[in-house]
From Swiss-Prot:
Transmembrane segments: none annotated. The lineage of its organism: Bacteria, Pseudomonadati, Pseudomonadota, Gammaproteobacteria, Moraxellales. It comes from Acinetobacter baumannii (strain ACICU). Interacts with PqqD. The interaction is necessary for activity of PqqE. This is PqqA peptide cyclase. Its EC number is 1.21.98.4. Pathway: Cofactor biosynthesis; pyrroloquinoline quinone biosynthesis. Belongs to the radical SAM superfamily. PqqE family. Residues 5-220 form the Radical SAM core domain. It is an enzyme of class 1 (oxidoreductase). [4Fe-4S] cluster binds at residues 19, 23, 26. The keyword Metal-binding applies. Keywords: 4Fe-4S, Iron, Iron-sulfur, Metal-binding, Oxidoreductase, PQQ biosynthesis, S-adenosyl-L-methionine. One of its GO terms (biological process) is pyrroloquinoline quinone biosynthetic process. Binds 1 [4Fe-4S] cluster. The cluster is coordinated with 3 cysteines and an exchangeable S-adenosyl-L-methionine.
Amino acid sequence: MTEGVGLPLWLLAELTYRCPLQCPYCSNPLDYAQHKNELTTQEWFDVFDQARQMGAVQLGFSGGEPLVRQDLEQLVAHAHQLGFYTNLITSGMGLTEQRISHLKQAGLDHIQISFQASDPVVNDALAGSKHAFEQKYEMCRLVKKYDYPMVLNFVIHRHNIDQIDKIIELCLELNADTVELAICQFYGWAFLNRQGLLPTQEQLIRAERITNEYREKLKAQNHPCKLIFVVPDYYEERPKACMNGWGKIFFTIAPDGMALPCHAARQLPISFPNVREQSLSKIWYESTGFNHFRGDAWMPEGCRSCPDKDRDFGGCRCQAYMLTGDASNADPVCGKSLYHQLIEQARAESEIDSSLGKLVFRNSRNSKQFTVQQNIPVQNIVDD
């Protein structure tokens, strides 16, 4: 199937699942600890070569924490030579002035640093790591020093959303150019912890109001900082156009070489190919995995005849699978879905008090335990 299939313009290279942090909202798979056979430097070079030949123009380096890879600078340099626009998506842990300097020399175009909270204590508690806030703060200053645009990302959830004003103030203190205030998206560990992370509707309305007030203040001051507020689809009545459609422009390569149409698709009961076994072109145009939800032939009636199908492409397949057990079902976010009550139930559960101590942190011990127990809830273990 090649007719009507677009180019894979955006390549996400998940270099590793290893990470020094333990964020309970991480989108990595719960069983990430069993996926250890990472692509080599040369194998990544080959992936980049093929993707560029196919028309890919933007390359994101992600993880896990991509800075764990000691060959990151080599990978960036190779991508730069090919003409990619390169973006490092990082927690800032493992970043040093020397590495920033080397990445700059290698041709890295963009660095996005994530924070957990504006308060150091809350930030480090959510990260499951001591001194994480201090490290991030210092790296932000160095990113500015090396003339990168300052792009900060905060995953917003019920434990930090009420400090949205302080979060924005921190970003202004750091001279951020762009701030993404993204309400938690519930995949991987975030889905496991959904009840403890989903903000209430009241919290969400307040946070968006405060963000809009800051936007007006910044506009009046002719301030360059741009605030982006990403709402959760759990409070919508129509689904998002996930990844702008399955297999339309987005290509993810997992650490072990599995090729995916989005970073959450690994959990689906679908066979996805590996770049060690097939070319990217064959994977993109011919593989069952990438063609599975292209077009509308797969859609159940109701979705197929819906006038919005060309806008939302049926919503998120991973979300449909996680909530209903069948990835072909209508995304339960949709108010027309037979499963919309599951979203309404999640909204109701957000009103139940939940402390940080009830969250399951993302670390290898919990991942291994989850893998062994296979869907039996894991204990809350925080690695020292």
